[in-house]
């Protein structure tokens, strides 16, 4: 049996081997290409990245030529190192280090030796390139910013690292890739497809012809142009209004979910992350953790929402049927909700939903929140019902927008409080601060903007997004999917009536814009930090949300100014100016505009530069840079995230 089996196995193996050799040699030419690799030079043709335009067709980001010196280590011969280093203004130590790095990548494949030469450096090297065997010029395209704003929206491009090369076979050493912003989100559209040329070499390593007449060559495909939803003029104006302030602005077109402005402050000129100084500038921005210019507050900062959250408290109470628009409560400058527990309020008298919202009465909203929770036999059930309503507004979750960064905020559930109070019971009184947007609730500015957009739409929203058009491409269908909240449409009208009178009778009565019906809500959130073991009061935050016009709204906006005192001090005026700018295309309230543009919170931020607070920042794992870089005139200070109680009522 063994005598028969062994020859049979050998025969079958031989047949398989012959078939494989036939396939590789006759059918599959790729092996021949690989075997000839020692006599073939590979050259890449890099396409231009797609241009970036705003919603109105204004060019924001174009391209400029860049030149890299590439090296193939095995081809470097008879090099005059002194002359070479002198020409490129590098030291011999730098030369040795760069060559060693190239050899590690591959002795036979090209990699970047020196990147992003300017035109003068390129011309000088090109004249004598023939003297330096193994080196050649690779042309690429770098970004050429047409504007000085929008850095957080655009992101930047940088060289790929080893991990990217390992995980994605498209990229080779020296290739560029988008990081942050739309450059990262839409990398595959913007980058295009690089072309490849295979060049036959002779025994003297000289180029002689295209390999096999160019049979394996591919043509570069240019990147796709894109239009953003951003209104360039509104974005620019928002950044100007936030100079010398810290915070975020997010403006959305309610009926589509298109992001009209996404402002973070402080910011920087995107042009500083282009060219030979890009790495140095990025490092300085990255380590500037006082100003944190790379931190997009509109998407990443999780704040206590303060009084604007009362909008949701009211809508959920209406939906749960625990109140109607005429349900009333008496306020005595506050609310005694438990023994020894008193929630302050600036209001007094009888409040129903309408004046409760425009006067921002803490007493009113604390009562209706407790009624919502107490509707159910167990507070845990009540909290989960309340929480599920809020999830339908996009709270407590990543919203699915098309930017590569973000936070989901914090939305407490019964599990939250079972964990917080494991040894004793809790009820609606224990967690009543949720009623006014404090307690355990945290929201990002984009969530606040989406919340007020939902109110403007009377109960629905489209996922906020930054892309409007891709040339030759299709917008993701998730941005065309309508999301409906759990709150019935009929409950939004009485709430909107109260928000409209915030501008007519309430906390924003001095911020009206002639000819525009605005609905909005002020917010003031107290701010505390623990310093040397003590709870210390810091300056309050200023918050404002609004939409306009009241009917057929065109813009919904959220503004958050850190340490901005109260809602109507900074966030309110900035909101009304942004609305006027977008709808009217001009500003009529010149004095107010001047005050906001020239106003600065630098003196306030300087108070928090004392050593105890700096030590607090260090303990919260924030590394401080001794040399912060800021291109625009922003103050550089940050504070640890602290949950706050809102006692002002506005």
Predicted regions and their residues:
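Intrinsically disordered, low-complexity charged/polar segments
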Residues: 474-479, 594-602
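Short acidic/His-enriched helical or mixed secondary-structure segments at domain edges of catalytic enzymes
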Residues: 525-527, 601-604
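Periplasmic/cell-envelope proteins involved in peptidoglycan metabolism and beta-lactam response
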Residues: 1-277, 302, 382-392, 435, ...
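Beta-lactam-recognizing serine transpeptidase/beta-lactamase-like catalytic domain environment
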Residues: 61, 202-207, 211-215, 255-307, ...
